[in-house]
């Protein structure tokens, strides 16, 4: 009986924790394996991902993956992105195409903004 009670308590706590977790915004990084600018951007995107656990990062290779390429086309069409060049960074309704180390990091950080402050529980 105690085992069942303990299991029920843990199950209830799991549902409460899942219910409190808000969905995260998605940052899309579309790249090509043959693109030198994409390779230059990758370490920055990895760093950004570590800094911002509040955002879900999706790194999608488009030259060898038809599903990723189709998603890229769909997102580009919706946002009015012309040309389909990579790297392309998309966050919510904003986008940046291209990357040059030292020039784009600030623009990308500004695009995603600062993390929301969590409310202080009393």
Describe each region flagged by the PLM:
Residues 75-85, 96-102:
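Thiol/disulfide oxidoreductase modules built on the thioredoxin-like
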Residues 7-14:
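Bacterial N-terminal signal peptides
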Residues 41-45, 69, 73, 105-109:
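Extracytoplasmic/secreted envelope proteins and their assembly/folding machinery
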Residues 15-19:
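Sec/Tat signal peptide C-region and signal peptidase I cleavage site
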Residues 1-5:
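Positively charged n-region of N-terminal signal peptides that target proteins for export
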Residues 20-58:
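Local sequence-structure signature of Cys/Sec-based thiol-disulfide redox active-site neighborhoods
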Residues 54-70:
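Thiol-based oxidoreductase modules, predominantly thioredoxin-like and allied folds used
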Residues 90-121:
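Non-catalytic, surface beta->alpha helical segment in thiol-disulfide oxidoreductase systems
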